[in-house]
Design a protein with these regions (language model features):
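Secondary-structure end/capping motifs
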Residues: 202-285
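Short linear loop/turn motifs
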Residues: 36, 44, 138-140, 245-254, ...
Length: 316
């Protein structure tokens, strides 16, 4: 069987481990797929333009900025699978005297950019907890790296920020006040994003890639040591781990949120669409499900493929 070369570009470094498991676990080869993996970190609009022009085939990500072009201009973007439905930047770094979300009223909260996915997540999270921007809390753009924002909190320049689990370790190491808060449903992580134009011309490759994705998720969730070996070998530089502990907590955090069956949850779609609608309020009435075509995953699921993988793990 001839290998297919699919041009895949990830939008965040945290996506790389699952793609590397697909590759180094042998699942791309197993299903007759070849992937050219590249980065479009911090290049949300460039990735969109390249996908639109057919200069790349699949984006891993671009979670909220495709609703507007689809809703307002009828562009053929589509999401085919979703690996994570949980917001994971749920570690609050706060000044002394702040012990939870309720204490952020009247305070100054910093994130990297409140038009980015990370910043918009915090806007929505605070809103869901009764804190409206402007009325109850001030949202300010801050440093890109969570640890740098944590330092600014400790210096009194901000009252609080939110970080992910690895940055939580680093913030605690420098003496920051770090509090775990509840999460919320959210479309994050590896999302298989493409266009209906590409899918219609490459259905076989799409099916094979999704089979490789399902296999990689199963491997990731059930073979901890082997997955950590792949992370250590192939992802340390891109993820910039500074210790084995950081690598381990990253892995455990990923495993806890990876979906065995890569469907989005309704609440996660609702929440990510709220981010898109904040940026483009004229599309409030648009149905976000228009962008989701899950029938390829459903085919794999209905065939019993995923259930057999996990049944074999339990009996093996």
């Amino acid at each position: 069987m001839a290998e297919k070369k699919i041009r895949v570009f990830y939008r965040a470094a945290g996506h790389v481990p699952l793609w590397k498991v697909m590759e180094e676990g042998g699942f791309l080869e197993k299903h007759g797929v070849k992937v050219e993996l590249g980065s479009r970190e911090d290049l949300r609009e460039k990735a969109l333009e390249e996908l639109r022009a057919g200069e790349l085939d699949i984006i891993s990500g671009n979670h909220h900025n495709l609703y507007a072009p689809c809703a307002l201009r009828g562009e053929p973007f589509v999401y085919l699978a979703q690996t994570n439905n949980v917001w994971k930047e749920n570690w609050l770094v706060a000044r002394d005297g702040i012990s939870g979300i309720r204490d952020l009223k009247g305070k100054r909260v910093a994130m990297d950019d409140f038009h980015s996915h990370t910043g918009l997540n915090v806007w929505l999270y605070l809103r869901l907890h009764g804190l409206e921007e402007g009325r109850d809390v001030e949202l300010v753009n801050g440093e890109k790296k969570g640890l740098d924002r944590a330092r600014k909190v400790m210096a009194g320049e901000h009252d609080a920020t939110f970080v992910r689990v690895v940055e939580r370790l680093r913030a605690q190491a420098i003496g920051a006040n770090v509090i775990e808060v509840s999460s919320m449903p959210m479309i994050e992580g590896v999302t298989i994003t493409t266009t209906t134009t590409y899918v219609n011309r490459h259905e076989d490759e799409v099916r094979r890639l999704l089979l490789a994705l399902v296999d990689a998720i199963h491997f990731f969730k059930t073979r901890r040591r082997d997955t950590l070996d792949i992370l250590n070998r192939s992802c340390r530089d891109v993820l910039k781990f500074q210790s084995a502990e950081e690598e381990a907590v990253f892995y455990d955090n990923e495993v806890a949120s990876l979906e065995r069956k890569p469907y989005p949850s309704m609440k996660a779609i609702q929440n990510v669409f709220a981010l898109a609608a904040r940026e483009n309020p004229e599309m409030q009435a648009f149905n976000p499900l228009v962008l989701w075509d899950l029938h390829y995953i459903r085919e794999i699921d209905d065939a019993g493929y995923i259930d057999r993988l996990y049944a074999q793990s339990q009996t093996g």
